[in-house]
Amino acid sequence: MTGKDLPLTEAFFYILLALRHPNHGYGITQEVQQLTGGRVALGAGTLYGAIQTLLERGWIAVWSEDSESRKKKEYLITPLGRTVFEEETRRLKELVSHSELMEENEQ
């Protein structure tokens, strides 16, 4: 992992979050929509482009593949992907903490 890996795009963040358990493309989009109350809707191009990039970076891996259908694959976050996700979560928590401090100081 390098410093240029962070910050994650919103799509990467939610895809990694949805892959804490094995999941396929449609399942990922459904979970992301549910998590965000519909605010984030991943189109097929965005989703599969992001999946390809995450696979290339080693942040996710193919978990299972339907031998009868070349399209049905499940993916899972890797240990490296989990590390990247945890670093991003720490970064976001720090941002929120600083924002809360600013609000407290203004009161």
What are these regions (language model features)?
Residues 83-107:
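Amphipathic alpha-helical dimerization/coiled-coil segments
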Residues 1-3:
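Short, intrinsically disordered or compositionally biased N-terminal tails of bacterial proteins
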Residues 55-71, 76:
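Beta-hairpin "wing" of winged helix-turn-helix
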Residues 47-48, 54:
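Basic amphipathic alpha-helical segments that dock to polyanions
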Residues 70-89:
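Basic, amphipathic "hinge/linker" alpha-helix immediately C-terminal to the N-terminal HTH DNA-binding motif
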Residues 16-17, 30, 52, 86, ...:
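A cross-family signal for key residues in well-ordered alpha-helices
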Residues 5-46:
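N-terminal helix-turn-helix DNA-binding core of bacterial DNA-binding proteins
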